[in-house]
């Protein structure tokens, strides 16, 4: 689990510096072999906004589980993911930080550093109502947005949660801010593959991908062709 999140942090810390740039542009800045290390900020690699958001999603899932175990009752997990996503978004603005914090990650300065340049996502998270697959908040499709589904895939597996519920929650977490079906269905696919890998780590990836595609057709095909 830790290795997966660290892998995201490491990869995005390197990758965001060359995002949306051509190979020629990268070579001009970093030499003929391209980017070979981090662009350090005060001696440290950046914790990017999508890494932060993935971590806060995990925080929300853990908060919901803890509440359920301690109090014997809880709301649907997506409510806690929405709450944690809003608190992260508030940390990315110079104003409007919440007076009551539910996410303990807000005490980690490196996970709250203002790094998000995606104003559309921040605007969506500031609205009174967040998106769902049935009632999308927008038609947005940001590739980094599916990182929110990573926590779902890590947190659940078939032994304790129905696979359809896992896939739906993967879609719902992305749909909070990304209204395009191609975005939130990708979240469902990612959650499906990761949860299955946890249960059966030796299954071939090609088989898992094909299985995930069929599962999406079965679960979402009547709504999205």
Model-flagged regions — what are they?
Residues 1-225:
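Structured, active/binding-site neighborhoods that engage oxygen-rich ligands
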């Amino acid at each position: 689990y830790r290795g997966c999140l660290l892998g995201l942090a490491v990869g995005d810390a390197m990758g965001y510096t060359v995002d949306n740039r051509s190979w020629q542009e990268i070579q001009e800045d970093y030499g003929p072999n391209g980017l070979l290390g981090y662009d350090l900020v005060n001696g440290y690699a950046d914790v990017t906004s999508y890494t932060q958001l993935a971590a806060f999603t995990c925080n929300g899932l853990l908060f919901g589980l803890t509440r359920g175990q301690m109090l014997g009752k809880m709301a649907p997990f997506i409510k806690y993911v929405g709450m944690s996503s809003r608190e992260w978004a508030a940390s990315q603005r110079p104003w409007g930080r919440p007076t009551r914090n539910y996410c303990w990650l807000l005490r980690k300065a490196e996970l709250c550093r203002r790094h998000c340049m995606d104003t559309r996502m921040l605007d969506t998270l500031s609205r009174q109502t967040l998106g769902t697959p049935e009632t999308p908040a927008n038609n947005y499709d940001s590739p980094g947005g599916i990182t929110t589904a990573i926590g779902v895939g890590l947190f659940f597996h078939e032994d304790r949660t129905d696979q359809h519920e896992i896939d739906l929650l993967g879609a719902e977490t992305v749909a909070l801010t990304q209204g395009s079906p191609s975005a939130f269905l990708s979240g469902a696919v990612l959650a499906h593959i990761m949860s299955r890998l946890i249960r059966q780590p030796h299954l071939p990836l090609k088989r898992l991908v094909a299985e995930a595609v069929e599962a999406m057709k079965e679960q979402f095909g009547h709504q999205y062709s």
